[in-house]
């Protein structure tokens, strides 16, 4: 397996269920030369994104069904 040598951009918000998730997914769609991640500062680990975020992404033709919230600093 080859390591991903692309620069990493991490989007951070409080819960990693809305803002950072949306920013990461939209950035990943537009900036393929980077690896995008997201995290939160006060997180309930392992929760899916908010239903409003899922709906907003869908409105832009984007999805992220595997997203689970994670605490900043765990990667």
Task: Describe the residue ranges of each PLM region.
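Short polar/charged helix/loop
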Residues: 1-75
């Amino acid at each position: 397996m080859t390591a991903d040598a692309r620069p990493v951009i991490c989007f951070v918000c409080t819960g990693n269920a809305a803002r950072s998730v949306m920013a990461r997914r939209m950035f990943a769609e537009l900036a393929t030369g980077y690896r995008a991640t997201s995290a939160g500062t006060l997180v309930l680990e392992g929760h899916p994104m908010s239903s409003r975020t899922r709906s907003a992404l869908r409105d832009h033709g984007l999805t992220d069904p595997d997203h689970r919230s994670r605490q900043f600093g765990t990667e």
